[in-house]
């Protein structure tokens, strides 16, 4: 990650813009969970970094404080069902053991069943798809528009989005700009061809169809503006970045934060998963053990303990190497973001996070402050 890239992160996404003072950069998610003004919380990052675990855990904590919570998966992989060991569909389903936490998994692939679906039997209706498809990605933007409009009308206190990997998520967040551009293009065409359209309306005796068409255009334009306003309101919407201390993940997190900055979308929390923390080492010196072994005459005992010491040294080397490697990227994360973000380091666990008990335990750890564990050789 270059210095120019690092310096390009805008202060507009910092804690200061969300009402936090310089002394409140806690290394936990308490302020996120306690912020009752938020309606939409997006959780995103590179694939395989623990987005679903993090979003599920955030939703569990929110369910303790909010009247109703919806966990909504837009990731085609739909790992939320696996996380809770419960099948979810495209309809809100109450999660087992909760009375106010729901989950749904939706397919964001383009469907013809959008608000812009037209009757292809009518002459003028055939023109619109050609115009729309001249904008790459407009079909996906239309689907996102319908999705976000339906979500906007849902009566939940807060919605947590378990998003797809970064590229797909950025397209979701960018759809208002693309849609407004395409619709603006159509509106301009209408103004330029107003006289011709009036002739066509008289010729086809189809005035209601023309008016209905542009009513749809104006409706979608207003809807896009409304959703974009929600995206850019830090009191209503925020983004939680999830990463692991590895090069590709840290680089993609930086790219994501820069894109969020450009779109004026609030982001003041970073969760770093799979972090190897220092161990509480026993007071044992391996060299002393070797010296003691040399005094033991029984060769069988010597062989057994020599093998044990050798394996212990190998494990220690792997552990230290891993700590040093992670510390390189944890140092970058700390230098880049510690002045503007809550950075929450979550430990590498021996078991996968599946089932309500494990998710609940993980969610509690998100609220516990932990120093960023930089290996001493990297200080």
Swiss-Prot record:
The UniProt entry, under Pfam families, shows: ArsA_ATPase (PF02374)
Write the protein's name.
Answer: ATPase ASNA1 homolog
Q: What CDD domains does the record tag this protein with?
A: ArsA
Instruction: List the EC numbers from the record.
Output: 3.6.-.-
Q: Which GO terms describe its molecular function?
A: ATP binding; ATP hydrolysis activity; ATPase-coupled arsenite transmembrane transporter activity
SUPFAM superfamilies, sorted = P-loop containing nucleoside triphosphate hydrolases
Species = Plasmodium falciparum (isolate 3D7)
Q: Where does the record place Low complexity bias?
A: 7-18
Top-level taxon: Eukaryota
